Swiss-Prot record:
Assembly and oligomerization: Interacts with UME6.
Gene name linked to the record: IME1
Gene Ontology cellular-component annotations: nucleus; transcription regulator complex
The keyword Transcription regulation is annotated on this UniProt entry: yes
The keyword Repressor is annotated on this UniProt entry: yes
Location(s), subcellular: Nucleus
Protein name according to UniProt: Meiosis-inducing protein 1
Organism: Saccharomyces cerevisiae (strain ATCC 204508 / S288c) (Baker's yeast)
Biological process terms in GO annotation: meiotic cell cycle; positive regulation of transcription by RNA polymerase II; pseudohyphal growth; regulation of meiotic nuclear division; regulation of sporulation resulting in formation of a cellular spore; regulation of transcription by RNA polymerase II; sporulation; sporulation resulting in formation of a cellular spore
Superkingdom, taxonomy of origin: Eukaryota
Inducing or repressing factors: Starvation of yeast cells may stimulate activity of IME1 through a post-translational mechanism.
UniProt keyword annotations, A-Z: Activator, Meiosis, Nucleus, Repressor, Sporulation, Transcription, Transcription regulation
Region of interest (Disordered), ranges: 102-135
Ranges of Low complexity composition bias in the record: 126-135
Function: Transcription factor required for sporulation and for early sporulation-specific genes expression. Positive regulator of SME1/IME2 expression. Directly activates expression of SLZ1 during meiosis.
Length: 360
């Protein structure tokens, strides 16, 4: 069946054989004049009747090719369902509005009972959507193309210029794709802070302690920080910016000499502090090279639990367990089985079950 379809497709493309009965019958020796009015030339559409205006294909001055060629060369090939191309209903779309519905009605004497939805009067838009959904095997793609057609139709009716295109009109008819659903689920499951770096990097339970620098003489007391200034160089090393991490957390240590390097005699406009005041933190800024910063986290350390003395049954169980584990390890080392992950899971479940039964 599939080979026959491919054969028909190749025959239609190479020999120019027309598979659609309602397409324009061209004579082999007659060439259409380019000056002919395009409105008189029927063109392909996914609709019921041969419309002078096609919503999908642009009009061309070239010789009109077969409708199957237009279909194959303008549609993504992976979206075309080959089983629908030669469907009887799809081949007779031009008569779908005028044909009687024999399959969906039952005539009994003088009355007619309809067993399905009425199809006698259908707009071109609904017919296009039905044929479009049957043409494409992917329902989501069909709905997207149908939405694009609605958007295009509304734009044509509004008679607006090309410069007046509103982006909202394009987005309004778009369907929800799987990617949009995944993004919505991602936003629901993971709630991120809008400003992740507004707070300090470390939690508030962090302790900030000072240690004695290694280059300080032993006779100098680390508490008397003013006496340490004579051991500093005249030009201090590079100091961090006022917004850096080290300079933001000296609020509880105000005994450090911050004004040593202020030469107020030469500069009368010098500020009281070496650093400018931080507008967000009302605390003195201290050079970070005085004392290196050591960060010690407050981890709640619970006392180690008392060791439980095992009875004879538990000791026997541990011996058997160790023997099993050693046997598993030996088997893995010799066999190098590809199912090691599976046996690891089984072994973990077995150990967990036995421990839960033993220590519950």
């Amino acid at each position: 069946m599939q080979a026959d379809m491919h054969g028909k497709l190749h025959a239609a493309l190479e020999d120019g054989f027309f598979l659609f009965p309602f397409e324009q019958q061209q004579q082999p020796n007659i060439y259409y004049d380019t000056t002919t009015d395009q409105e008189d030339r029927p063109c392909f559409s996914f609709g019921s009747t041969i419309s002078p205006r096609s919503w999908h294909f642009e009009k061309s001055d070239k010789i009109a090719s077969s409708q199957l060629q237009n279909l194959v060369h303008t549609q993504p090939i992976h979206l075309i369902n080959p089983q629908i191309l030669f469907n009887e209903e799809f081949l007779n779309l031009e008569n779908i509005d005028s044909q009687p519905i024999s399959k969906e009605t039952k005539t009994t004497k003088d009355c007619t009972m309809a067993t399905g939805p009425e199809r006698g009067k259908k707009s071109s838009e609904s017919t296009r959507s039905s044929s479009l959904s049957s043409l494409f095997s992917n329902d989501e793609s069909a709905s997207t193309f149908h939405s694009s057609f609605n958007n295009h139709d509304n734009f044509q009716k509004s008679n607006r210029n090309g410069d007046d295109i509103d982006i909202s009109d394009t987005i309004k008819y778009e369907t929800n794709t799987n990617a949009q659903k995944d993004i919505k689920i991602f936003q629901e499951n993971f709630e991120f802070n809008e400003f992740p770096y507004t707070q300090d990097f470390y939690p508030y339970t962090t302790n900030y302690t000072y240690s004695k620098p290694t280059n300080i003489h032993e006779s100098i007391n680390s508490k008397n920080t003013d006496s340490y200034s004579q051991y500093q160089d005249q030009f201090p090393p590079h100091t961090d910016n006022i917004h850096s991490f080290n300079n933001r957390h000296y609020s509880n240590h105000k005994s450090t000499n911050c004004n040593y390097y202020n030469n107020t005699s030469n500069n009368n406009n010098a500020s009281d502090n070496v650093y400018e005041a931080d507008p967000f933190i009302d605390e003195p800024q201290v050079p970070s090279y005085y004392y290196p910063l050591e960060i010690a986290f407050d981890v709640e350390k619970s006392p180690p639990p008392s060791l439980q003395k095992l009875n004879s049954k538990e000791l026997e169980f541990l011996k058997k367990l160790n023997s099993k584990l050693s046997r598993y390890a030996a088997a893995y080392s010799f066999s190098s089985s590809n199912d090691q992950d599976y046996y690891d899971k089984v072994r973990f479940q077995e150990i967990s079950y036995k421990f839960s039964k033993t220590y519950s």
